């Protein structure tokens, strides 16, 4: 029971900080004068998350194996304390641009949804039409609602990402993990993803994006979504090829390093899609709803993880657990290739949806620009 309580605290803490920290970081830049820097910020923001994953994914297991369980958690606690001290010190030095508290925008949005269903109209909730909400807030809410289909496009790709700890891990168990005389833990391959994210982020920010901007070829938001989703499909294709190679050879003979391309492809896709989704939630949402949009973006990622778990469970007849004591027998009836085919198809459907949504995105973007240029001050949420 104590463990469940602690997991609940992690959930509350992560949910509270994740939806706000990226918004606060982006608010340190001027929306017009630093427009290009906002894209750079979200690229490096996502890279910094993965830098933490690298440190945690490598140092923590070593401390756990070489010292003890307590030391591994004390290390993480020390990192949290250091981050908190640095953050508070920055506030003490007046280094932050801080938006004024405006009440619970989440509660207000929920009320708008309920009243809109009750009255079968969003417009009828305006005070000018005898509704309960200020006209400006309803206009902002409409812009926010139009963002939801765009943010939902992250679901197929995040379902692919979830397989790094399921199907990809099982695949690694069946491979030769000998690395210069050391039997590498299969789960350690997961660290290829954050390492690749950090490296590719720097390459994109320093080389590719500046070159594209100079030639006025910087891809739009949904084109980046499209590229990211295609890279997810490419990762699955790489995993499928590796799976067929494993099936064609005796177990434990194919090197685990053949998994690197699929992890690198996912890493590149994460930068194009996930970091861009953070950017969309911030730049396209009205001022008082940016944190709400960020939270909804994270909710869609959580939905993707839940759907991935459900699909994995539904496909369990194809995906038997790998048994090290009876490896050959556990492979009988295994069809991870079918599972990969399904996910590749899902990714391609998601990529096509990204392209089909481009006209809708242009209307949403135009509406967001109009709201931002109208000079309407943030509406206080009561």
Predicted features by range, described:
Residues 1-382:
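Hydrophobic transmembrane alpha-helices of multi-pass solute transporters/permeases
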